[in-house]
Every structure is written in structure tokens, then in C-alpha cells.
């Protein structure tokens, strides 16, 4: 039986943290390699209309959002690792269930089948949201010493950020190689593997808190970070639109290269602590989109998306820092959950909008450009207002 003793580690990367990190990686890849490309796979063989295919993404993100209201109650009334285990297993089952709708002899025409498809996507979002929050916002933090928890938060977020690109790259590479339901079996297997890895880590028993409500925003959403969450959603929505309209391995790999460069640049204190880092990042992403508008050339699949990815990662990282700094120490899990909600919410809504506008690529990219402009304005206003308040209280 587990005891209340928690081992002390002098460094962040130990055996248990590494296992949980790998589990996070597998969980996110299992989702991001199957869900974002679901509209494409459904519409390619005329199994669903483009409108219905986009609704599957909307249903997924609604499931992610609604599941957050019950997260605090679940982890207070049941063992946290078992909540994750069951959620990850259910995610694998729903991923397998999606294959039944894609590979059919006849298109989906009956209304009951449309509702069933949307219900499966909603369930996928609900169990993924629960699993992701429990793992990155609770289990990873539980196995981390207090002095390392900020780094643990950043690690979890950066893993999610990279898998947003790694997942679609794997899907594009395996799409032609894995025919039929085998593609979904790979995604489900990754989800199952993440569940097994988490169960290999022992967690101390924690007595449940009293007075926990069934529906609550505790460990789900940070109200004081609503403006920051809006900016994050706008930024990631632009990313989702651009990924959808230019869904190639070369483009996604270049965006990921930009993410990696941003991760390295953020180790420089001058970059990490820059007051207008988010506005600068958005400006770089805007420049990249404008360069794509200007003319098509060899840099459209290399340099331009790398600059775009660098700007997006720089801006969203700055918003993460602001979100964590705006919360109390005991609210870090809530702040990270807020980031996850806004980041994935914006990303998948952008993907849905992008698939709906695939026949009008320029219009879709103009929408992405407008979203980044609005995000830049909000970022700049927030910085100026904060500076004005600091002078007023000085």
C-alpha cells in the first residue's frame, strides 16, 4: 500500500519524472496524430460533408472544455493515477471507434450516424482533457520538488507544444503506409502505453479535501488570467489555421524547427524577461504570413514557416510566464490547466475554421493574420496598462 512518504530529489529529471514525461509525450501524440487530420480523412473518401467533418473538431474541443468542470471532484474522490489510467484507456477506445466511421463502403448519410460520430468526438475530447489535466497539472507536479515545479510546468507545456506539430507530421508520414484501421490502432496503442507508464510510478495516498463540489472551476480555469487566455487562444487559432491550409511534412517540420529555436532563445535572460516579447513574437509571425502572401518560392516550406513557428512559440511562452506569475503558488495547476484550455481550444477551433476554408487558402490566411493583429494589440495594451498601474502604486 502506498504511504504518504514522497521521495526527495535534488534534480528535476529523475526516473519517475522521466516516465511521466514520456507518458505525456505519448498521450499528446496519440491525440494530435488522429484528431486534427480527422476532417481530411473523413472528407477524402466522401464519408462525411466538410461541414460535418469540421463539427467533429468542435465537438472534440467542447468535450475538452466541459470535462474540466469535473476535474477537481474526480481527483479528490478517486486515486489520481487511476483517473488518468481510465481516461487514457477510454481515449484509446474512442480513437479506435473513429475508424468505424472513416472506412465504410457508403458515405455517412443517416442522421443517427452523424450524431454518433459527434458523440464519439465529444467523448474523445472529454477523456483527453481529463487525462491531460490529471497528468500534466497534477501527477507531474506531485512527483516534483517545490523548487523544481516551475521548470516542471514549462516542461509539460513545451512537450505539448512540440507534439502539436509532431503528431500531424507522423500522421502525414504514416497516412499512406498504414491503410485501414491500423492508423488508428497506432494512436490507440500510444494512449495505452502512456497509461501503463503512469501505473509504473507510485504515488502517495492523499486524503480527499472536504466540501469539494461536483462542478467547479478549481484546477480548471483561472478567472484573473482570462485576458491572457484570450491572447493564447488567438495565437494558437492562427497556428491551427496555418497548419490546416499548408498541411505538408515540410511546412510542419519547419514550424517545429522554429519552436526549437524559440526554446533555445528563451534560455537567454534578455529574451525570456523582455517586456514586449509576446508582441515581438506576434510581429514575426505576421511578417512570415505576409511573406507567404507576397509570392510563392522555395522559402514557403522552409524559412517562412520557421520564422512563423519561432514567433508563435515566443509569444505563447511569454503568455505562459504571465499566466504563472499572475497566480498564487497553490494555483499553479489551475494556471496550467487554463493554458491548456486556451491553447488547445484556440488550436482546434483554428483547425476547424481552416478545414472549412481549405478551398479559399488566402482567405483563411487573412483570418490568421487578423487574429495575430488582435492578439498583438491586446498584448501591447496589457503591458502598457500594467506599467501604468505600477507607476500609480509606486
PLM feature segments, named:
Residues 5-61, 224-254:
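Helix-loop boundary and gating motifs at the non-cytosolic
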Residues 25, 109-131, 300-315:
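Hydrophobic core of transmembrane alpha-helices in multi-pass small-molecule transporters
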Residues 89-110, 283-296:
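C-terminal ends and interior cores of transmembrane alpha-helices
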Residues 120-159:
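Cytoplasmic helix-loop-helix junction between adjacent transmembrane helices
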Residues 148-171, 340-351:
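Glycine-rich segments within core transmembrane alpha-helices of 12-TM secondary carriers
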Residues 182-200, 365-386:
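Symmetry-related core transmembrane helices of the 12-TM Major Facilitator Superfamily/SLC fold
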Residues 275-319:
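C-terminal transmembrane helical hairpin of 12-TM major facilitator-type secondary transporters
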Residues 327-362:
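A late C-terminal transmembrane helix in Major Facilitator Superfamily
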Amino acid at each position: 500500500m502506498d504511504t504518504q512518504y514522497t521521495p526527495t530529489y535534488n534534480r528535476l529529471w529523475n526516473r519517475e519524472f522521466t516516465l511521466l514525461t514520456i507518458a505525456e509525450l505519448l498521450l499528446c501524440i496519440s491525440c494530435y496524430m488522429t484528431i486534427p487530420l480527422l476532417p481530411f480523412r473523413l472528407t477524402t473518401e466522401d464519408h462525411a460533408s466538410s461541414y460535418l467533418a469540421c463539427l467533429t473538431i468542435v465537438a472534440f474541443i467542447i468535450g475538452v472544455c466541459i470535462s474540466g468542470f469535473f476535474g477537481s471532484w474526480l481527483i479528490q474522490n478517486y486515486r489520481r493515477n487511476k483517473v488518468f489510467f481510465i481516461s487514457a484507456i477510454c481515449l484509446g477506445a474512442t480513437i479506435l471507434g473513429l475508424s468505424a466511421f472513416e472506412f465504410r463502403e457508403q458515405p455517412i448519410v443517416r442522421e443517427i450516424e452523424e450524431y454518433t460520430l459527434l458523440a464519439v468526438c465529444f467523448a474523445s475530447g472529454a477523456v483527453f482533457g481529463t487525462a491531460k489535466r490529471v497528468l500534466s497539472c497534477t501527477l507531474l507536479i506531485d512527483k516534483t520538488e517545490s523548487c523544481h515545479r516551475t521548470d516542471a510546468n514549462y516542461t509539460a507545456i513545451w512537450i505539448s507544444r512540440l507534439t502539436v506539430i509532431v503528431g500531424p507530421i507522423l500522421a502525414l508520414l504514416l497516412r499512406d503506409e498504414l491503410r485501414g484501421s491500423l492508423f488508428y490502432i497506432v494512436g490507440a496503442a500510444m494512449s495505452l502505453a502512456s497509461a501503463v507508464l503512469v501505473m509504473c510510478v507510485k504515488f502517495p495516498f492523499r486524503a480527499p479535501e472536504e466540501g469539494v463540489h461536483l462542478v467547479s472551476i478549481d484546477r480548471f480555469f483561472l478567472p484573473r488570467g482570462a485576458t491572457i487566455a484570450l491572447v493564447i487562444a488567438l495565437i494558437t487559432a492562427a497556428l491551427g489555421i496555418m497548419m490546416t491550409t499548408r498541411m505538408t511534412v515540410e511546412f510542419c517540420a519547419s514550424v517545429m524547427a522554429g519552436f526549437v529555436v524559440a526554446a533555445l532563445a528563451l534560455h537567454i535572460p534578455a529574451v525570456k524577461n523582455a517586456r514586449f516579447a509576446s508582441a515581438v513574437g506576434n510581429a514575426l509571425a505576421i511578417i512570415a504570413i505576409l511573406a507567404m502572401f507576397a509570392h510563392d518560392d522555395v522559402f514557403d516550406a522552409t524559412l517562412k514557416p520557421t520564422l512563423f513557428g519561432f514567433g508563435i512559440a515566443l509569444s505563447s511562452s511569454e503568455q505562459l510566464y504571465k499566466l504563472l506569475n499572475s497566480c498564487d503558488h497553490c494555483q499553479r495547476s489551475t494556471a496550467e490547466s487554463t493554458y491548456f484550455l486556451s491553447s488547445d481550444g484556440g488550436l482546434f477551433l483554428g483547425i476547424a475554421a481552416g478545414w472549412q476554408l481549405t478551398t479559399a487558402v488566402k482567405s483563411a490566411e487573412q483570418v490568421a493574420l487578423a487574429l495575430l493583429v488582435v492578439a498583438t494589440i491586446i498584448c501591447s495594451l496589457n503591458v502598457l496598462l500594467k506599467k501604468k498601474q505600477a507607476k500609480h502604486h509606486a
